Amino acid sequence: GVRTSGWFSGRKRRRAQRHTRDALIKLAEGDHRQVEKLLSRDADHAADPLANYLLAAEAAQQRGDEIRANQHLERAAEVCADNQIPVEITRARILLARHEDHAARHCLDRLLEVAPRHPEVLRLAEQAYLNTGAWRALLDILPSMEKSQVTTEQHLQDLRQRAWLGMMNQAMAEQGSEGLKQWWKNQSRKTRQDTALQVAMVNHLIECNDPQMAQEIVLAGLKQQYDERLILLLPRINSPAPEQLEKVLRQQIRQHGATPLLNSTLGQMLMRQAEWQQAADVFLKALEQRPDTFDYAWLADCYDKTGRPEQAAKMRREGLLLTLRQNPDQ
């Protein structure tokens, strides 16, 4: 009797091996129905029943059979009671494929407690957190992602950026401009010194019609380092003290040289203070450095205000010709 049962189990083992081998070929061919059938048929006798059930679950999910996928997952959990990590990873992957993002996130939160540096857990958690807008949780796993080297430095940087912008938008949506300002004050100095975040914050404040704080952030940012993104924001701030911005711009010109951008921005600040002649001078300087349709239009306005209509008309013509040259098809 013992020999007979040994012969039977050996035969089943060999058949399971053959089925597993055939299943891998079908997997390469993309035939998920056959993959699932072959892997699950003698899974209990396979060399690694857990792997068979998990692959069968994924194959069933690939062809949209959620009931079979769940059955294979439950069976995998039974055959491998002492190590549930592979089962839960597969479960999370299947939930994400079904767009059940919150359930996947719950599953991954639990996995991160037991396997905080597991590359696949981190990769799936990134996906689940992005899909559910769990920005704080995403920020929290970035150090582990860095240590586990699951992605590039650039991708980590992009994720960090997205997470902070997501948190900023959340604060704005939930508590409006006051909540956003409070949120900003609560951040670390390092965060508040990130230029991309400063730019996003100022854009929000301009939208909320809070020029005072917008100006404070831009000026603090420029004090820390010169960045064209901050300079480009200045004309959009409806400043209660344009002379303060003018002073800062002149300082930037002394430090970094009179670039076309700095000249043009200074011209716009001078126009706000009705300093038409001074504004015309700096717009001219900017145009000597390079042609620009906006600068031609602003310079024409300055000439109008100082009683020089012919020169104003000439500048408008130059601006129009430039536009036509830049867009020949229109």
Q: Where do the language-model regions lie?
A:
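TPR/TPR-like (Sel1-like) alpha-helical repeat modules
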Residues: 79, 113-114, 126-151, 215, ...
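Alpha-helical adaptor scaffolds
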Residues: 57-61, 74-77, 84-93, 160-169, ...
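Alpha-helical segment of the N-proximal tetratricopeptide repeat
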Residues: 12-48, 55, 62-65, 90, ...
